[in-house]
């Protein structure tokens, strides 16, 4: 069985804007994936649509209800994947918790603009922003990049690309443009309690995305303490040694094992489907 349980569409701000769900489903069919989950950031709107609209002409495999939830726990930002929940109740909850895509991206953008102005950094407020399609951190970073006067600021803080900027502004409290995402996103328990209440399970996404040992230990401890049901063992960023370590941790603690491509249609190397799965029968065996 060929699975991919971590796929995004353009309902997520971080995905390619042309990547509508129809296109994604056709790609999954062409890839001959047996089982997939569309896990858009902070919304499960696709799965509500999928209950109303017949998509079997686009994709003939099994679709598991899914969503990727942004989380902030004690100042640490990461993602949790939710699966197998009631999509309608969850859509209502996600809008109350995160707001619409436009709401949350505009809110983040406005806070960052205020910080930029307070630090007297160069920025063009006349460049339009559309929270429905624009990723707030990307908008701010690319806007600031246009001004050579900001080069010294970027160099001083070791920022050479968008990933550096995003990580600094969401994880480094001493960074001048740090935004406490705990004021924007819920904590682990809020997500776990709700998803469990609507019949679903919660999985830690990309446990080893951070190469910081302290962060990894914090995330794995958080899984066990907050009732998270599983971990995403198989991911393109995980090495063979990473997978071996995570499999051992999951089996020891009787956790659900999942895997996915984290496909968003942006990077040429980011392909649908996952390889090197040791035991397909272990993948997302729901409790």
Predicted regions and their residues:
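Conserved, well-ordered alpha-helix/loop/beta-strand core segments that scaffold catalytic motifs
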Residues: 174-224
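A broad, low-specificity signal for short, low-complexity segments enriched in glycine/proline
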Residues: 28, 38-46, 162-166, 191-196, ...
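Mid-to-C-terminal alpha-helical segments outside catalytic/metal-binding sites
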Residues: 274-287
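A metal-dependent hydrolase metal-coordination microenvironment
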Residues: 1-143, 226, 232-270, 276-277
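Short charge-dense sequence patches
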Residues: 1-2, 58-64, 143, 167-175, ...
